[in-house]
Amino acid sequence: EQLELGQRAADALEHTWSKVRLERIGESDPELEETLEALTARFARLEDILIKRVFRAVVAVELADAERVLDVLDLMARLGLIESTDQWIELKELRNTIVHEYELDDLPALQRRVYQATPILQRTLKAVSRYAASQAAGSSS
């Protein structure tokens, strides 16, 4: 269920991400600006779903004691589902910047960071999907 929610969010993000070219970010184009607004919002949504829903579901499956976000991220790193805890702390900070609208004076820089970080979220969701499939296969035998 959490993975399905994550996949729907990832599909929406991928749809928007595929319309953007890194070198065009910062151009004065109303259509591009609208697409970039959708990109940042969808990025923040997927990051939120991964940390608050998908990763928490993994914690439950692992019967782990991980209440704090840092503990959750450490567990995900130990399981090989994320590249590093530090990277995800940066992603969480990026999401907070989007949601709380900090750094709006340099919106193109923020949008470039989101564009470049999007594949990390997509890879992570795929890794968690593989993990879930292996857990399901292990429990059915």
Kindly label every feature range from the protein language model.
Residues E1-S141:
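Solvent-exposed interaction patches of small proteins and small membrane subunits
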